[in-house]
From Swiss-Prot:
GO terms for molecular function: dITP diphosphatase activity; ITP diphosphatase activity; metal ion binding; nucleotide binding; ribonucleoside triphosphate phosphatase activity; XTP diphosphatase activity. It is an enzyme of class 3 (hydrolase). GO terms for biological process: nucleotide metabolic process; purine nucleoside triphosphate catabolic process. This is dITP/XTP pyrophosphatase. It catalyses: XTP + H2O = XMP + diphosphate + H(+); dITP + H2O = dIMP + diphosphate + H(+); ITP + H2O = IMP + diphosphate + H(+). InterPro entries: dITP/XTP_pyrophosphatase, ITPase-like_fam, RdgB/HAM1. Belongs to the HAM1 NTPase family.
Length: 200
């Protein structure tokens, strides 16, 4: 099954491709829409994932997959939330520094990564799946692997950040992995819709 990857984010593509490829699902990444054309006006991760997937499916008349993800920190919930990528407005490193600064006098450092995956068909049909990864915010930036908030996020049961644990651990345990697992569990329903309804 071929699905358009509805994002320009190379890191997300690599992570999702490694998870989906063994299941005979091929991500097509050479389909691009100027991000300025897609207004992520949703108030939830699910809504924004649906907006992106629907835009690509409609433009290219093909099934599209999109994700919207971020981190929710209990002490300042619902932030950074859907604003995770642009929390500081100055990129990943400054986002992380801002979080550490906001939490410096707070005991509660619990946090969770959230990922919403949306599969959209050109006819408007959409399937959505959510995954979470629980953990805590570190006291300092640690590790150079990964991207986003990985250098300050310590998964439950670990002492290292995702930035230290690396891609092998993340591929198996991340919020994106959990969301994609939920998608894969429902894969037959999606394939049936593709074969017997949309392609009819």
């Amino acid at each position: 099954m071929d699905i358009i990857f509805a994002s320009n984010n190379y890191h997300k593509f690599i992570e999702m491709e490694s998870i989906l490829k063994p299941h005979q699902i091929t991500l097509l990444k050479d389909f691009q829409i100027d991000e300025k054309e897609i207004i992520e006006s949703g108030l939830t991760f699910e809504a924004n994932a649906q907006i992106k997937a629907r835009a690509f499916a409609k433009r290219f008349n093909q099934v599209a997959i999109a994700d919207d993800s971020g981190i929710i920190i209990e002490a300042i919930s619902p932030l950074p939330g859907i604003y995770s990528k642009r929390y500081s407005g100055l990129g990943d490193t400054v986002n992380n520094i801002k979080v550490l600064d906001v939490l410096k006098n707070k005991e509660n450092r619990q946090a969770r990564f959230v990922c919403a995956i949306a599969i959209a068909f050109p006819d408007g049909k959409i399937f959505t799946y959510v995954g979470n990864m629980l953990g805590n915010i570190a006291l300092n930036l640690k590790g150079s692997m990964g991207f986003g908030y990985d250098p300050i996020f310590i998964p439950d049961g670990k002492q290292e950040t995702l930035g230290e644990l690396g891609s092998t651990y993340k591929d198996e345990h991340s919020h994106r992995r959990h969301a994609l697992n939920n998608f894969l569990e429902a894969k037959d329903e999606i394939i049936d819709y593709w074969r017997y309804t949309w392609k009819k």
